[in-house]
Amino acid sequence: MSHKSDLIATNIQKYLQQHQQKELLRFITCGSVDDGKSTLIGRLLHDSKLIFEDQLASIVADSKKVGTQGDRLDLALLVDGLQSEREQGITIDVAYRYFSTDKRKFIIADTPGHEQYTRNMATGASNCDLAIILIDARKGLQTQTRRHSFICSLLGIKHVIVAVNKMDTVGYSQQIYKSIQDEYLKLAGSLQIPDIRFVPISALDGDNVVSKSTKMPWFRGSPLMHYLETIKIDYAHTDEFRFPVQLVCRPNSEFRGFQGTVVSGSAKIGDTIRVMPSGKITTIKSILSFDGELNEAEAGQSITITTYDEIDISRGDMIVHKDAISHVSSMLRANIVWMSEQPLIEYKDYYIKFLTKQVIGSVNKFNYKTDINTLKEVACGTLELNEIATVELNLSEPVCFDSYQKNRTTGAFIIIDRLTNVTAGAGMVIKPLAANDKKDSTNDYSEFELELNALIRKHFPHWDAKNLRE
């Protein structure tokens, strides 16, 4: 991790202690192709003195070979690491960079601007707290600008910095900047992004990136780095306790523990817990980790929980606090971002994976898809690559989840093609649907027939057996 600090040279122990206590901000750079995302990240690192000498020497040499800025230093090469990216002068994969300043630690996700790589962008944005959306001052808002903004809103990113880049190419015009700002605010009226900041920059020349530019005296705001260091992110772990069971650990007849990672909230020894979906209640007897026994476990920790009661707990179950239960349903409404070249169609079976739980499921209704240009709802019967829709899902068995708006981890799932095992889509739960709607459709079949039907569809998908639960 790159970092500039005087403490490194004088007191390494104090530096490490201080570094460990810093807030971590995960952010993403997104926008249309050639808006300057990779160059901006390179400029942030360069002007913050966070590039090692050997890295700088390598970039100087590579700029002469494959650079796109003539005789100037091509800072985009710091993050465009794939050979195909350098040859084409574009970003294809999601590139992650880690650095810190005296105020914060940062993880940057640099994502592709090309439409065909929108799925990579959605992947990069899924864990971020903030998004920098770049707009080329010469081109204004593009289709990908709208698509990426909508995906950021969909994924629950609350803070967006709109960086109007390449201001040097339009003579640092305040009028052009204001026009783009007004157009984006009009778009933002249809999005759920509560905090939007604007800053005019030139990533190539460094204007308003780390230091305030003298070339735009009309801009009264702060440079980009100041916003990154000071924007208040809600880090409070106030989410309800959620512990998806990944593995049942039974090394001998005397021990039975349940292993996994705490995805939200916290729990301590003696807490009364409920196992979902069964609803059975027990008490935490001990919490074990790699470092030994813990009194309390928090989000992000990998632990083993033991209980006082011998109750049935399996992989895919969710352990929660007694009175903070999650939804349990086999029918739900969700937003889908489709990532496969093969379209999503109604009633086709896929694997639906919620954390440690995988079931078979299908779309039994397309509510609508979203037109990226207008953000209006459009009727549809299928979903193509990079399209976004709201659908109703039918699952082979009940699963535990929260709404994505409430919990970004337990409210998310992926859709897997059963024949190729390719991740075909990503989903965000809106809400569960009424359970009695499900029961009405299965009254004509016994439980054995339903289970046999599920087994046939799981192991012989090429038979195209009808889902009896629909």
Curated annotation (Swiss-Prot):
Q: Which GO terms describe its biological process?
A: hydrogen sulfide biosynthetic process; sulfate assimilation
Show the segment(s) annotated as G2: 89-93
One GO MF annotation is: GTPase activity
Region span, G5: 202-204
Q: Which Pfam families match?
A: GTP-eEF1A_C (PF22594), GTP_EFTU (PF00009), GTP_EFTU_D2 (PF03144)
Q: Which residues form the signal peptide?
A: none
Region G1: what ranges? Answer: 31-38
Residues where GTP binds:
31-38, 110-114, 165-168
Q: Where is this region: G4?
A: 165-168
Domain tr-type G span(s) in chain numbering: 22-236
Q: Which reaction does it catalyse?
A: sulfate + ATP + H(+) = adenosine 5'-phosphosulfate + diphosphate
Ordered alphabetically, the record's keywords are: ATP-binding, GTP-binding, Nucleotide-binding, Nucleotidyltransferase, Transferase
Keyword tRNA processing attributed: no
**Which pathway does the UniProt entry assign to this protein?**
Sulfur metabolism; hydrogen sulfide biosynthesis; sulfite from sulfate: step 1/3
- Residue stretches spanning the membrane: none
Instruction: Report the enzyme's class at the first EC level.
Output: transferase
Residues covered by region (G3): 110-113
Q: What assembly does the database describe for this protein? A: Heterodimer composed of CysD, the smaller subunit, and CysN.
Q: What does this protein do?
A: With CysD forms the ATP sulfurylase (ATPS) that catalyzes the adenylation of sulfate producing adenosine 5'-phosphosulfate (APS) and diphosphate, the first enzymatic step in sulfur assimilation pathway. APS synthesis involves the formation of a high-energy phosphoric-sulfuric acid anhydride bond driven by GTP hydrolysis by CysN coupled to ATP hydrolysis by CysD.
Q: Which family does it belong to?
A: Belongs to the TRAFAC class translation factor GTPase superfamily. Classic translation factor GTPase family. CysN/NodQ subfamily.
Protein name (database record): Sulfate adenylyltransferase subunit 1
Q: From which organism does this entry originate?
A: Francisella tularensis subsp. novicida (strain U112)
The UniProt gene name for this protein comes to cysN
